[in-house]
Amino acid sequence: MIRFTLFGVPVCIHPTLWLTLAILGRIFAVTSMVDLICVLLFIISAFVVLLTHEMGHALVGRRLGGGQPSVYLAWLGGDCTNETARLTRRQGVMMTAAGPLCSLAVGVVAYVALSLYVGSFVLGGEMTCLFALGILPAEVVMSFPPLAIFFFFYLIKISCWWTALNLLPIFPLDGGQIMQGLMKSRMQMHLISLTVAVVMVLASASLGCWLLTIFMVLLAVLNHKFYRELRHGGTDFH
């Protein structure tokens, strides 16, 4: 376990986070030192995005409702807790939305930095700031230190994917928690979450994204469980 404090917020990192990120970075496909460096850059980039995401929850929650937040990172994601905070429903939605906004901000900053870094060079009269769009000439790519470019690219890619995933209206993802804060009926919220999760299972399976498929299956099962409990006597409205 790695423990430290950032901006007054205790942070705990479980070893499973590094294991998961290494697998996603294709550590088992490494055949050279360059491959290994790319995997390490992927892990660092993903860690920056995940930590920034959870710190967004923590700092905004503390600002709005006080208390002492803490951040725990494990597997593929994290959890921000602040049991002593006093938040209204609206403030809870704002705190939840702060996570995806902060992780997206990482990608925006990386995109601007990459554009300024690469776009300050001209080759044949063509500005090269279009690298992030995937149309940078190969000759230009070879003329820059590749580590910096890979790092920026990973930050942009992971930031976009992580933000999009978390904003899906599936409980307990951020999108689902925002939906919970805006809706009165928990049963309806879980039904919507279940429906979206099933759609995502079918979509990700058709694309061959098996890790995402498994993740969505778990979320579908979880929301189906909550929905059945509420339907058979649970407290629906909150």
Predicted regions and their residues:
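Hydrophobic transmembrane alpha-helices and their immediate loop junctions
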Residues: 1-238
